[in-house]
A protein has these predicted regions:
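Accessory nucleic acid-recognition modules appended to NTPase machines
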Residues: 80-179
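Conserved Walker B catalytic segment
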Residues: 1-12
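Short regulatory helix/loop adjacent to the ATP-binding pocket of P-loop NTPases
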Residues: 19-35, 47-52
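Conserved AAA+ ATPase small/helical "lid" subdomain
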Residues: 60-88
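Conserved small helical "lid"/interfacial subdomain of P-loop NTPases
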Residues: 38-58
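Conserved nucleotide-binding/hydrolysis micro-motifs of P-loop NTPases
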Residues: 17-21, 41-44, 169
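Structural recognition of the conserved hydrophobic beta-strand(s) that form the central parallel beta-sheet
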Residues: 10-16, 37
């Protein structure tokens, strides 16, 4: 508060974890902050910036690039060059998984987490259940409880690595039965 009294300024706290403003920090700031969740670019936003780097690229080529690299704004600074972009995205992934997920949640089996993350990323847009992942891992001689799978997915969601999309085709008690 002394900064705001002595200086006419705004203070920004950034982070890649939903728990950042939970607990003590939220209590200290109580009512004096506004939270903004910022997502990667939509395709329309990506296209606008991509056109500054590749002005003659077709919409189809731009969309393919968007599907391949995603919508992280900094990629434009790398001129969408494949190798630097892949390295940048790999570094973000390692930072989020290792710092925000493994350390914050004290995960001991990092290999299991990496396998679950790879599965979820490889199955974007498809419906799956934690029990089916646990059964598959059991067939690979890795015993894991469905609750552990759910917890790992929850931790990744809290770190903004995943975004859960709720099913819209369920009604009534079917919603309660879905995991």
């Amino acid at each position: 508060n002394s900064f705001r009294i002595e200086l006419d300024c705004d203070i920004y706290i950034t982070g890649s974890n939903a728990k950042l403003l939970s607990g003590e920090l939220a209590t200290v700031l109580g009512g004096r902050y506004v939270e903004f969740t910022i997502y990667p670019f939509s395709f329309a936003e990506f296209l606008e910036l991509y056109r500054t780097v590749e002005p003659v690229a077709s919409d189809a080529a731009a969309f393919q690039q968007y599907l391949t690299l995603g919508g992280m704004p900094y990629l434009a600074n790398l001129r969408y060059a494949p190798e630097p972009c892949r390295q940048y995205l790999h570094d973000i992934y390692n930072s989020v998984v290792l710092n925000d997920v493994v350390r914050r949640n004290k995960i001991r089996d990092v290999d299991l987490l990496a396998r679950i993350v790879a599965y979820v990323i490889g199955n974007i847009g498809t419906t799956f259940a934690s029990t089916s992942i646990a059964k598959f891992l059991k067939s690979e001689h890795r015993t894991v409880a469905p609750e552990t799978v759910l917890n790992y997915i929850k931790y990744c969601t809290e770190a903004y690595l995943f975004y859960q999309v709720n099913r819209e085709d369920l009604q009534g008690k079917q919603i309660l039965a879905t995991n």
